[in-house]
């Protein structure tokens, strides 16, 4: 049960789907769920959200990526949950790499701790979530520098990205009626009490639920686990998506809060060739330790751990 700290009870809502990555599954299910009457509206929203990386202007790269999706090769998609507040450029406080292999119908969900100490191209060593605002300030683009940083850190190719404004995530949860999760430990934050066990969250509660880390004995790793749980639960529920009356509202929210380099063709290809991986997800954590450097706390990851992550994801992608 979730309650206000003054013990005011909140009514539970029905369990409905909403993916933290927003666009990918919701749009695919809208298209596949028989509501073709709004296909043009879906297309318009996808056009609004479509924001290619600067490197996508290279026709050879575009040809390579298009061929990769067409031939059902494994792909890596970087999810960026960006927390934008007044006077803030935004930071990618949620970074999750989805590695999807359609040949085995398997998916790896790798959570990247936001305080991971890495080399950010053009900036030097810093927290990995600072790549996003640095990219904006440097004029190369927040998603662009985030993708480049993840690629160079783990020596893995990122084929697509999805960026979600976390405030839009809150609106989306409300639009579809809430999400149900299993809370591993009771805690209070943001004016809410989150009981241990199965709880149903509205948008604001869900945002507070995935943001908390200071009360979690596992810190960022516990926070990442809650984020993954919200995503997995929503993806599983999305298979029975039926809120057609909410479709227009959800599309508006997506158009205002999501950007991605996935166009309509790639989204339809994901629906056709990649959707089966939703039922076989392996979660991965990055092991490391906290260390204070020049008065700032960082999450230090060894070269051996970086190599392990690379090896597991590369092996997963090469499976037939």
From Swiss-Prot:
Locations listed in the record: Cell membrane
Keyword field: Cell membrane, Cell wall biogenesis/degradation, Membrane, Signal-anchor, Transferase, Transmembrane, Transmembrane helix
Entry keyword Transmembrane helix: yes
Molecular-function GO terms, alphabetical: phosphotransferase activity, for other substituted phosphate groups
Membrane topology: Single-pass type II membrane protein
InterPro entries given in the database record: LytR/CpsA/Psr_CW_biosynth, LytR_CpsA_psr, TagU
Sequence intervals crossing the membrane: 16-36
Pfam families per UniProt: LytR_cpsA_psr
EC number: 2.7.8.-
Family: Belongs to the LytR/CpsA/Psr (LCP) family.
The protein's name: Polyisoprenyl-teichoic acid--peptidoglycan teichoic acid transferase TagU
Organism: Oceanobacillus iheyensis (strain DSM 14371 / CIP 107618 / JCM 11309 / KCTC 3954 / HTE831)
